[in-house]
């Protein structure tokens, strides 16, 4: 990262978080690196434990969340300690043998688990193996990306495997993640979230609305401008913060169409999107959800 990029990066952080919070986060990061280094020296030769470390984009969601749900449903938390690396406050009702630690705050206990766990699985903040003998995997988040991300995501050599949905998409995944193709680390078995579409559990639409619709459409545009990654992935002007819809008049026309068809459109804003850019508003047949409202629904 060049000096100008670093300056821009910190300006964005200060704008989004405030000066004191931005400085505090920077200090926490450096302390966390030191604690992690210190823990590596202590636990480099100790036995690996039956621990699974999980991380996902917005905690308990995406592929990490789907895999976690599977582990709990099948009772694997009785054999394995499950440790979550969290972006948000830890829930008070975690199941037996499940712990959570804030991903960006220094914690010797967190470092201990990272150094002694047999498995490290991540969706967003990529954890590679910390020491020999560990198995680490990148589960990815969302579906496969429909935008070119090569150069923005580079999987570390310490990652043992990356999930891939099909042979056809494998070279695209490799290019997006900065790994050679072919690469034996690519495992073509689909994603844990795919299982959600093949179960008999009723959906969660009732948490969003009590109305009945002929059709429900879920639109999940990827982020254009991130809140803290110093990235702006769109050169186009987006007055409402999302593509396609140019102004509130077009939203009103779309809402009128949905109303005539008795259809609901759910616009799910990407968790990393800078919410200050989002101007689209909910209407009778349009619901707008972001990372904060999703957590409130849970």
Predicted regions and their residues:
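Membrane-proximal basic amphipathic "stem/tether" segments
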Residues: 1-50
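Generic recognition of flexible, low-complexity loop/linker segments
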Residues: 40-42, 109-110, 125-126, 205-207, ...
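Active-site and donor-binding regions of nucleotide-sugar-utilizing enzymes
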Residues: 49-200
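Surface-exposed cleft-lining segments at the edges of enzyme active sites
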Residues: 53-56, 236-245, 293-296
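Conserved catalytic-core segment of nucleotide-activated headgroup transferases in glycan assembly
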Residues: 62-68, 193-279
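Short secondary-structure boundary/capping segments
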Residues: 99, 153-154, 180, 203-204, ...
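Donor nucleotide-activated moiety binding/catalytic core segment of transferases
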Residues: 103-117, 266, 271-298
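Structural alpha-helical scaffold elements that stabilize or flank donor/cofactor-binding regions
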Residues: 112-114, 155, 210, 257, ...
């Amino acid at each position: 990262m060049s000096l100008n990029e670093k300056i821009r990066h910190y300006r964005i952080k200060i704008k989004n978080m405030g000066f004191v919070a931005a400085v505090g986060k920077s200090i926490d990061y450096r302390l966390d690196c030191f604690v992690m280094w210190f823990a590596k020296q202590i636990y480099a030769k100790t036995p690996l434990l039956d621990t699974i470390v999980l991380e996902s984009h917005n905690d308990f969601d995406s592929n990490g969340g789907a895999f976690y749900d599977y582990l709990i449903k099948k009772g694997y938390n009785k054999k394995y300690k499950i440790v979550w690396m969290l972006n948000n406050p830890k829930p008070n009702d975690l199941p037996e043998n499940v712990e959570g630690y804030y991903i960006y705050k220094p914690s010797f206990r967190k470092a201990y688990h990272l150094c002694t766990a047999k498995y490290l699985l991540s969706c967003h903040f990529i954890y590679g193996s910390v020491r020999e003998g560990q198995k680490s995997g990148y589960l990815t988040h969302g579906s496969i990306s429909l935008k070119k991300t090569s150069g923005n995501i580079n999987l570390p050599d310490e990652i043992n495997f990356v999930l891939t949905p099909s042979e056809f998409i494998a070279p695209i995944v490799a290019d997006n993640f900065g790994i050679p193709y072919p690469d034996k680390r690519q495992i073509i078995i689909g994603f844990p979230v795919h299982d959600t579409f093949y179960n008999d559990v009723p959906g969660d639409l009732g948490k969003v609305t009590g109305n009945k619709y002929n059709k429900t459409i879920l639109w999940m545009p990827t982020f254009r401008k991130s809140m803290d990654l110093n990235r702006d992935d769109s050169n186009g002007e987006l007055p409402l913060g999302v593509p396609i819809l140019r102004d509130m008049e077009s939203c009103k026309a779309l809402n009128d169409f949905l109303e005539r068809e008795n259809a609901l459109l759910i616009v799910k804003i990407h968790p990393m999107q800078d919410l200050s850019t989002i101007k689209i508003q909910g209407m009778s047949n349009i619901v707008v959800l972001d990372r904060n409202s999703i957590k409130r629904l849970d």
